Amino acid sequence: MPEASTSAPRQATVTRKTSETDISATLSLDGTGTSSIQTGVGFLDHMLTSFSRHSRIDLAVICKGDLEVDDHHSVEDVAIVIGSAILQALGSRAGIRRFGSALVPMDESLARAAVDLGGRSFAVVKAEFGRPVIQGMSTEMVGHFFTSIASGLKANIHIAVLDGHNTHHMIEAMFKAFALAMKDAVCIEGGGIPSTKGVL
């Protein structure tokens, strides 16, 4: 299990060390979108930098993984740790908007994302890519990234590529749509716990 500590409201640091990966992630939900990403997987670094910028979540990630095997463990565990850190930073989730959605074009590509931070882990990812690998990241791991972050975050995430043929553009549109959906979902609106049950 990840070990977590909150250093200030809406901030968290989470670490996870296994025989496969050694990861630390620090973030602030009320940031400006600054980031420092070192996962060892070039394309994942690029996508997480974009996620940070467009969600306005300050994010620092360091991962040492068994890339001599492949990228699976690093991508999966980085997603789990980031999701866990966001969950810790949210605290009781009192006053958050909870839901967020976005539609993002990138040239010929179009992606849609919807998020519910209601405590139910589930992910649906619909995308087909023409390239098996891009900058060290297996494209089959894109869907697994979102499934894993949903698990760590205890969130319901739906992401779909609606159009496109350039693999880079399609995946980047997905991450940007997810970022904008998260930006909405984590924002503070007030009004207590956003659930008729009274808890999340």
Swiss-Prot record:
It holds the Pfam family IGPD. It is found in: Cytoplasm. Its main location: cytoplasm. Gene3D superfamilies: Imidazole glycerol phosphate dehydratase, domain 1. GO terms for molecular function: imidazoleglycerol-phosphate dehydratase activity. Pathway: Amino-acid biosynthesis; L-histidine biosynthesis; L-histidine from 5-phospho-alpha-D-ribose 1-diphosphate: step 6/9. GO terms for biological process: L-histidine biosynthetic process. Keywords: Amino-acid biosynthesis, Cytoplasm, Histidine biosynthesis, Lyase. GO terms for cellular component: cytoplasm. Its EC number is 4.2.1.19. It is an enzyme of class 4 (lyase). It catalyses: D-erythro-1-(imidazol-4-yl)glycerol 3-phosphate = 3-(imidazol-4-yl)-2-oxopropyl phosphate + H2O. Belongs to the imidazoleglycerol-phosphate dehydratase family. PANTHER family: IMIDAZOLEGLYCEROL-PHOSPHATE DEHYDRATASE, IMIDAZOLEGLYCEROL-PHOSPHATE DEHYDRATASE HIS7. This is Imidazoleglycerol-phosphate dehydratase. It comes from Chlorobium luteolum (strain DSM 273 / BCRC 81028 / 2530) (Pelodictyon luteolum).
